[in-house]
Amino acid sequence: MTNNNAAKPMAKSKITTIRPKNFDDDAKVIADCLREDIPVIIDLEHTSPEHARRIIDFALGTTYAIDGDVQQVNDSVFVCTPKTVMVIANKEEPKQERDFSWLTRKM
């Protein structure tokens, strides 16, 4: 007799980290991952403000189109998630409004 209630191994979850260098290549990777329900961490620490603005604008549009979300982790790191993934913030800190003002500073 087969036990249908036996624990089954879960598929491994994936998450991708992008440190943008080339808009065309990196934007495609971000979109492809999100379309495949893979969350993306975008690290803009070493990205020019102009390039960072384009990447974040693209990521915001992509996540909106798939009913996903973008959360800012710190000044230069963002987490983009498909609708199948929920980011739970530290309950001790109130949820902050999105502040992308650093993207608009002049070079």
What spans do the regions from the language model cover?
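Positively charged, small/polar-rich N-terminal and surface patches that mediate targeting and assembly
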Residues: M1-V40, E45, L60, Y64, ...
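Short, solvent-exposed loop/turn segments at secondary-structure junctions
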Residues: P49-H51
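Acidic, glycine/polar-enriched metal-coordinating patches/loops
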Residues: I55
